[in-house]
């Protein structure tokens, strides 16, 4: 039986020993994994830790503001926010292969972290890597940017949650007193919306994806299903379909909805979702977001599918 209090005590001591009197930075996304890793590390080394949030331009709506409010204002962590939108989007121009996208994003993250580390004289990079991340990477299912790190990286990596699964991390978050908005926050892929925009990442598709995800999250929460579902999100497919706007033909993007239940992300199943909820989401996406012709719902379990499309 997992004992969160015991784990916290042991992890804090282990982090102290690993980092010692050196400075460290942590890659902070605002999700539960990196948040727990940040609080544990802060308990261990205090102000020798600097949290770094990289605004890649691939984040959810309001993500940056939420991170600043929670970690700088409420939790009092040293927080650096890096605006790297142009850098990431330029590097992704013309790239359609999902593994290539993940590798480009992973390399850019490390470049940014190493630059910050050099500025503040940090020697250690703390990450919120959990067990499913490295299991999927080793199994060559898909690369996780926080596992497939580039050779020659100068920072030493510390991963206090490496052997844990998401349900255990949530128990730690509760024990550490993190707000419910973080404890129950649904998992979000490290490469962000880049893997929810199939094919080439463009500003148009990113904007559609960001707005569609905001609508899905809002409607699922209104239906009180947010704590019941493991993940619920929207994906912009790399193809278009014919639709009708007024009396005119249109040829625009297809948005796919994905909603699954899971305990640890190693397997997942699609539950029966109220049809009126799906209809509401579809109506809002097609009426509120320009250039969307159609909304579809993915009913594939994991396996054979993965939870994310890319």
Curated annotation (Swiss-Prot):
Database matches in CDD domains? GMP_synthase_C
Q: What sort of enzyme, by top EC class, is this?
A: ligase
Q: What's the EC number here?
A: 6.3.5.2
Which reaction is the catalytic activity of this chain?
XMP + L-glutamine + ATP + H2O = GMP + L-glutamate + AMP + diphosphate + 2 H(+)
The organism's place on the tree of life at top rank: Archaea
Q: Name one GO cellular component term.
A: cytosol
> Where along the chain is ATP bound?
29-35
Which GO terms label this protein's molecular function in UniProt? Answer: ATP binding; GMP synthase activity
Q: Which residues form the GMPS ATP-PPase domain?
A: 2-185
Name the InterPro entries on file: GMP_synth_C, GMP_synthase_B, GMPS_ATP_PPase_dom, NAD/GMP_synthase, Rossmann-like_a/b/a_fold
* Keywords, sorted A to Z: ATP-binding, GMP biosynthesis, Ligase, Nucleotide-binding, Purine biosynthesis
Any one GO BP annotation for this protein: GMP biosynthetic process
Record pathway: Purine metabolism; GMP biosynthesis; GMP from XMP (L-Gln route): step 1/1
Query: Could you give the subunit structure recorded for this chain?
Result: Heterodimer composed of a glutamine amidotransferase subunit (A) and a GMP-binding subunit (B).
What role does this protein play?
Catalyzes the synthesis of GMP from XMP.
Protein's UniProt name: GMP synthase [glutamine-hydrolyzing] subunit B
Give the classification, highest ranks: Archaea, Methanobacteriati, Methanobacteriota, Methanomada group, Methanococci
Give the gene name. guaAB
């Amino acid at each position: 039986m997992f004992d969160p209090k015991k784990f916290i005590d042991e992890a804090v001591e282990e982090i102290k020993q690993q980092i010692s009197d050196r400075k460290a930075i942590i890659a902070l996304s605002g999700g539960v994994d990196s948040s727990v890793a940040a609080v544990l590390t802060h308990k261990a080394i205090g102000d020798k830790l600097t949290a770094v949030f990289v605004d890649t331009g691939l984040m959810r709506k309001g993500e940056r503001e939420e991170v600043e409010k929670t970690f700088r204002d409420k939790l009092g962590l040293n927080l650096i926010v890096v605006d790297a939108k142009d850098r990431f989007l330029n590097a992704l121009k013309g790239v359609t292969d999902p593994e290539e996208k993940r590798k480009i994003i992973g390399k850019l993250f490390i470049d940014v972290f190493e630059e910050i580390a050099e500025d503040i004289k940090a020697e250690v990079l703390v990450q919120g890597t959990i067990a499913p991340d490295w299991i999927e990477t080793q199994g060559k299912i898909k690369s996780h940017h926080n596992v497939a790190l580039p050779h020659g990286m100068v920072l030493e990596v510390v991963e206090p949650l490496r052997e844990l699964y998401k349900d255990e991390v949530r128990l730690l978050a509760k024990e550490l007193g993190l707000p419910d908005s973080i404890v129950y926050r649904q998992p979000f892929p490290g490469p962000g919306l880049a893997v929810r925009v199939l094919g080439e990442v463009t500003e148009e598709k990113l904007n559609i994806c960001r707005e569609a995800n905001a609508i899905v999250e809002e409607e699922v929460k209104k239906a009180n299903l947010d704590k019941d579902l493991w993940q619920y999100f929207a994906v912009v497919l790399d193809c278009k379909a014919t639709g009708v706007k007024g009396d005119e033909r249109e040829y625009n993007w297809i948005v796919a909805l994905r909603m699954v239940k899971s305990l640890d992300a190693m397997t997942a199943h699609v539950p029966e979702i109220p049809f009126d909820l799906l209809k509401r989401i579809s109506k809002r996406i097609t009426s509120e977001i320009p250039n969307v012709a159609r909304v579809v719902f993915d009913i594939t379990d994991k396996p054979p599918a993965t939870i994310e499309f890319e």
